[in-house]
Each structure stands twice: as C-alpha cells, then as structure tokens.
Amino acid sequence: KCRIIREFPDIVFKGLTLVQVSQKFGKAGFEDVKKVTEEIVHLNEDCCKGDAVECMMERMEATDHICEAKDKLSSKLADCCAKSILERTPCLLALPNDESDLSKELKNYYEDERVCENYKKDKLLFLAHFTHDYARSHQESSPQSCLRVSKGFEGLLEKCCASENHAECLKQAPILLEAALKEIEELRKQNCGALQLLGFRDYNIQLLFRYFFKMPQVTAPTLVELAGRMTKVAVYCCGLAENKQQTCAEEKLDILLGEMCEKEKHTFVNDNVRHCCVDSYANRRKCFTDLQRYPNYVAPKWDESKLHFNEDLCKGSEDDQIKKKLEVLVEYMKMKPDCGPEKLKEVVEAFRKIDIKCCAAEDHQKCFDDEKAGLLQIIEAH
C-alpha cells in the first residue's frame, strides 16, 4: 500500500480502496462506502509516514466508525464488531465479501439519455459511482481488473460524449465490459491449464524463458527468483475455486511486480520495463503480461566459463540446486538469445540428463568434466 501511495498519483490509491471497500460491502450504498473509503485512505497515508502509534490509533478509530455504521454496511459485521478493539481489525480484514444483488450489465451507465450530461457535470463523481457499482457486482474480478475497466470506461465516455451521436457511440460499452471479463477468464484458463499440463518444474522453466525475452538484461538470480515466485503464485491460486483464481493471482502478482519495480526504479533494465512499472498501476500486471521480446538486446560474446557445469549444482537444498541450474540456463540464453524454442528444448533436455547422471555419480565433478564437452557441443551447435 505504501509503495502505491509513494509511486502513483493520489487518485490511484483512492480508486483501489474504493473498489476494495465496494467489494467487501457489496450491499452498501455509495455514500456509506465513500465515507469508509476516505477514512481508510487517510489512515493509510498517515501510517505510511511511519508513526506507528498514530497509525494504530487511527486504525482503531476507523474500525469503530465501521462498526457504528454496521447496519448500513453489512449484515456480516455484527460478529466482528462484538469482539474486543484489538481483535476487530483482523476480523474485518478476514470477513468474506457481501454479495451484491446488482445486475452485472449496469445499463444505466450507458443507456440512460442523461449519461453524458451527468458525466460532464462531475466526471470524478460519475466514475466513482460506476467504479463502486462495477466492483460490487463483479466480486470475481480483482481490484486491479476493476480499475482497468473503470479506466477503459472513462476513455469511452470521453470519446462518446464528444461525439455528435453519443447514444450510438455508447453502444460499445457492453462490448468493452464483456471483453474485459473474457480476457481475464482466458488468461486464467491459459495459465492454470499450462500448470496442470506441464507440472511445476516445466511451467517454471516456461515462465523463465518468457520473462527472459521480455527483460534479457536482468541478472540470472533475479530472473530465476521472479519466475520461481510467479510459479508458486500459480500453484497456490490455481488450487482455489475457479471464481477466486483470477483475484488471487492478480493481487499476488501485483505485490511481486511492485517489489521488482521498486528494486529496478533507479536503473530500469530497459524502457519497456520502465513503462510497465511507472505508467499505470491498474495496467501494470497486464503490461508485463503483454510485453513482447525486447528488440534492442545485444548479446555478450560467447564465454563458456559463465556456464558453471560443476559439482556445485548438486550441493545445497533441493531449492538451491534448482536455482543454480536455472541460472545456468539463463546465462546460456543471455549469450544465445536467438535460439528457437526447439533448440531451447534440446538444451534443457541435454542439461537435465547430464545433471541427473552426474548428481547421482560417486564423483560429481569427474562426471561433469567428462560430460561437459558433449553438452557444449549441443549448446554451440546453433
């Protein structure tokens, strides 16, 4: 939260909080949700300044105010509000979302003849109402996805309300809303399907390759860590009920990518990564997903000494061994970025066979020394 407050305009965190509160209290009216949102935004801004005592006091005040308004917000609040002051906050955070009985179509936002009049009167307020209604009627969508839809709808309103026939133009709205849902559903199926088909190890390698080509300048350990954490996110989230998978994945990837962007912000590895990190919070995950191969990468001169085929690959925990082996693959790709998928597959399989053989051998190092020439022959045949 503090990273979002620091790195993006105020309206981003306000919008994110509005979505989260709207989804939590799905039956609550806009004005009540707005009050809670404003208080949560204010307390987080203060908490991020580092005053722990003031932060705790404001958090307790906020929970008091939520409990005072419990009848307006949610029927599920009674149990949490009956707890002690210290127990209330964790209880509220763990509270399941209140389902809304609102239609997902939200036709009043694009079929009403006064849409453009109302939008022009107060654009921010109109969009806040839309965001509130969209979020509470789409509980299966992540907060980031809801913000993307809201941003897309804003763009449509700007275009249509400036046109001569705005009613005709606004007929694109349901197409836009449906496309957003279709995209995230396809992404969910694609990733969970690939994980199920490939298994942890090969899905991890696939992600490693995919992100290497997006950001080939990143160091091997950083790339291996990123792909590994993404794979663990997929394993956890794809194990949940289908309607929870997308929200789970996007929220966890949002934290992961935020951490990476924080580390990279002083010297971004390339312009594409910089663009994804700083241009739009709502579109950050989508931006990284959509990134294509970085076109301006210049590979270093071939140097086989960077490929550490030795007994170290068999030492340490299983996780440590996997990381070291994947780092060798990244170093290979850095020097041979133009190898195609078939060549990559051939190299991975050859490396895997030698690794299994040598780590099972009595003398690991002698085995690697004996096998290295044959592996390098496969690697360099490009």
Swiss-Prot record:
It comes from the Eukaryota. Ca(2+) binds at D51, E54. GO terms for molecular function: lipid binding; metal ion binding; small molecule binding; thyroid hormone binding. Keywords: Calcium, Disulfide bond, Lipid-binding, Metal-binding, Repeat, Secreted, Zinc. The keyword Disulfide bond applies. Residues 1-178, 179-377 form the Albumin domain. It is found in: Secreted. The keyword Disulfide bond applies. InterPro entries: ALB/AFP/VDB (IPR000264), Serum_albumin-like (IPR020858), Serum_albumin_CS (IPR020857), Serum_albumin_N (IPR014760). One of its GO terms (cellular component) is blood microparticle. CDD domains: ALBUMIN. Zn(2+) binds at D51. Plasma. Its main location: secreted. It holds the Pfam family Serum_albumin. Disulfide bonds join C2-C48, C47-C55, C67-C81, C80-C91, C116-C161, C160-C169, C192-C238, C237-C248, C261-C277, C276-C287, C314-C359, C358-C367. Belongs to the ALB/AFP/VDB family. Serum albumin, the main protein of plasma, has a good binding capacity for water, Ca(2+), Na(+), K(+), fatty acids, hormones, bilirubin and drugs. Its main function is the regulation of the colloidal osmotic pressure of blood. This is Albumin. It comes from Aquarana catesbeiana.
